[in-house]
Swiss-Prot record:
Lineage of origin: Bacteria, Pseudomonadati, Chlamydiota, Chlamydiia, Chlamydiales
Catalyzed reactions: D-glyceraldehyde 3-phosphate = dihydroxyacetone phosphate
Biological role: Involved in the gluconeogenesis. Catalyzes stereospecifically the conversion of dihydroxyacetone phosphate (DHAP) to D-glyceraldehyde-3-phosphate (G3P).
Active site, per annotation: 118, 188
EC number(s) reported in the record: 5.3.1.1
NCBIfam families: tim
Disulfide bridges in this chain: none
Any single biological process term in GO: glyceraldehyde-3-phosphate biosynthetic process
GO cellular component, one term: cytosol
Protein name in the entry: Triosephosphate isomerase
Transmembrane segments: none
């Protein structure tokens, strides 16, 4: 376990330089979605934080609890190498938006990064690319790192439209960010989310390479090379190593398998470090 908070618990903006100088780092984020009570979260973190598996400085680990658990989780991980993420944010800083949470509110309680446009937000709550662009910008302006989630449906994939869909999501979703912004990308094919289907590593590599090329065209080659691109979609320990071996895969966005500390640690342990 890390004990030096100042060295190992720096906020994401500081990582921009670190990522630029050490591109081999891998990110593993666990999205709890709408799961866990306070008691369940405390039980999870008690066993999770104490694991020696988290002592590898080349693997950046994050948990993404529901809003109700963010404060408690922040207190629990504050002296650990674990970073804290939120599942979404509103694009406005404040206002009459009953039930919403803003980026300044999240930053104020110690959130480091925030998911933008997770497939469930896009397809269940009908969040559109222009709004997601505003949310990503709000995260940046509040001092957090946006994790822009992109992906195609099964119908879009089978029709050969994957790259067109991703290009549109990237072009609009990143359009409000400053030229030198630090952000993370997560490719999560909709047809693999919660279905048990995992994309073949060859397909994942091809898609991630396309995304990196697109980032280079939208920003610069330098930003493209240092931007982490994660894969998400029914990730389990059996698949973690083969996926992380892909040259353009810089980590994993884990869903259901992150609800068990044992399963999540197994995935982290399997991630390959170049």
């Amino acid at each position: 376990m890390f004990t030096d908070k100042e060295t190992h618990r720096k906020p994401f903006p500081t990582w921009a330089h670190l990522l630029h100088s050490e591109p081999s780092k891998q990110f593993v984020f666990g999205n709890w979605k709408m799961n866990k009570t306070l008691t369940e979260a405390q039980t999870f973190l008690k066993s999770f934080i104490s694991s020696d598996i988290l002592s590898n400085p080349q693997i950046i680990t994050g948990i993404i609890p529901p809003f109700t658990l963010l404060s408690a989780c922040q207190q629990a991980v504050s002296d650990s190498p674990i970073f804290l993420g939120a599942q979404t944010t509103h694009e406005a800083d404040s206002g009459a938006f009953t039930g919403e949470i803003s980026a300044p509110m999240l930053k104020d309680i110690g959130v480091d990064f925030v998911l933008i446009g997770h497939s469930e937000r896009r397809h269940i709550f009908h969040e559109q690319n222009p709004v997601l662009a505003e949310k990503a910008a709000a995260a940046i302006h509040s001092g957090m790192i946006p994790v822009l989630c992109i992906g195609e449906t099964l119908e879009e994939q089978e029709s050969g439209a994957t790259q067109d869909i991703l290009l549109n999501q990237l072009t609009i979703g990143l359009s409000k960010l400053p030229e030198q912004a630090s952000f993370i990308l997560a490719y999560e094919p909709v047809w693999a989310i919660g279905t048990g289907k995992v994309a073949h590593p060859d397909l994942v590599q091809e898609t991630h390479a396309f995304c990196r090329k697109t980032i280079a065209s939208l920003f610069s080659k330098d930003i493209a090379e240092r931007t982490p691109i994660l894969y998400g979609g029914s990730v389990k320990a059996d698949d973690a190593r083969s996926l992380s071996l892909c040259p353009d895969v810089n980590g994993l966005l884990v869903g259901g398998a992150s609800l068990s500390s044992e399963n999540f640690l197994s995935i982290i342990q399997q991630v390959d470090i170049p």
